[in-house]
Regions:
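Active-site segments of SGNH/GDSL-like serine hydrolases
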Residues: 77-81, 99-132, 155
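Oxyanion-hole/transition-state-stabilizing segment in secreted/luminal serine hydrolases
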Residues: 19-22, 51-93, 118
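Structural motif
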Residues: 5, 72-75, 109
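A general structural detector for well-ordered alpha-helical segments in enzyme core domains, enriched
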Residues: 25, 29, 61, 92-99, ...
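Serine-esterase "nucleophile elbow" of acetyl-processing enzymes
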Residues: 1-47, 59-70
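Cell-envelope and extracellular/periplasmic
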Residues: 13, 44-49, 76-84, 139
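Catalytic His-Asp segment of secreted/periplasmic serine-dependent ester chemistry enzymes
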Residues: 117-199
């Protein structure tokens, strides 16, 4: 049997904060894994982390959770904190590129989830530029990228939840939407698994 280890780097959204069910998008994705497969998830969340900080910590935290006897996968769930940090788009792109190139050198397969909108038009205009920059970096490396920004920027269910939460976190609907996007952007193919029929 294959042994699969998946490390997930990201922000508060990895913890499911704001979700009454406590599952978040990651728990919902994990629940859809085929039964009988040896897949271990290692979520490593850090609140308010920008890409520079993510680049600094990823190796020390992720590599110790991988094994030479397992297939090792890395999910990078990006936030929009570079905006608050005043990081330029060029620097954001470079940080992500360095992380992905490092992971490739380590023999780790990567999957990238983009930042989400916050329901604030002025802020979201910056998220849109950041998302486009991230997408370009990932596309050049032929890595899967989940664009969360464009599908959610005008979604009523998403906007209703994030604009009513004091920390602009989604709830049950929003996390379900992120999970759906992840599952339908090549998730199972990336892991080399067959999706089970849910009907």
């Amino acid at each position: 049997m294959r042994s699969i280890r998946v490390v997930i780097l990201g922000d508060e959204l990895l913890t499911g904060a704001g979700d009454p069910k406590g599952l978040g998008w990651l728990g919902r994705v994990q629940a859809r894994l085929p039964k009988g497969e040896d897949v271990a998830f290692f979520p490593l969340a850090m609140v308010d982390e920008n890409t520079g900080e993510l680049l600094e910590r990823w190796k020390s935290e992720a590599l110790k959770r991988f094994s030479p006897d397992s297939e090792n996968y890395l999910v990078v769930a990006l936030s929009s904190k570079d905006i608050e940090a005043g990081t330029t788009i060029s620097r954001s792109r470079l940080n992500l590129a360095s992380l992905l190139d490092d992971a490739q050198r380590e023999g780790v397969k990567t999957f990238v989830v983009g930042p989400t909108p916050k329901g604030n038009p002025e802020y979201d205009a910056e998220v849109e530029h950041l998302n486009a920059g991230f997408y370009d970096v990932v596309k050049r490396r032929q890595i899967r990228y989940v664009d969360c920004y464009n599908p959610l920027k005008e979604h009523e269910g998403w906007l209703s939840e994030v604009t009513s939460h004091p920390r602009t976190l989604p709830g049950q609907v929003g996390y379900g939407l992120i999970a759906w996007l992840v599952l339908n952007r090549g998730w199972f193919e990336w892991l080399g698994l067959v999706e089970e029929d849910q009907s």
